[in-house]
Amino acid sequence: MKRRDFLKKSLLGAAALTVVPRHVLGGPGHTAPSDQLTKGIIGVGGMGRGHYGYAGTRLVAICDVDRNHLDAGLQLAGEKIAAYHDYRDLINDPNVDIVHIATPPHWHGIMSADAARAGKD
């Protein structure tokens, strides 16, 4: 390789790094998207809304059988996220890495087992 070609390619590579937004690469004050867990919350009544803002996670889906809770949960999210009435649809969503279950206690067992079978943490 000629020195001129080497310098051109080196400069192009260095310039490309300055074009990439900071939030994509991570670093101080920024988490790269690949280092962030995406989560879904099943049950977005009073308890479920407390699960919205955990560090290192990004909310991508919510689920509730009560339409009023679901609508309020979507408003609280403040961004476009998936909304489901059936928890099985949420746990089968390929965009969801982890699931928070904030339903009445008698539902936790079956939902946890189904989430584990679907490969969700």
What residue ranges belong to the model's regions?
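N-terminal glycine-/serine-/threonine-rich beta1-alpha1-beta2 phosphate-ribose binding loop
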Residues: M1-D121
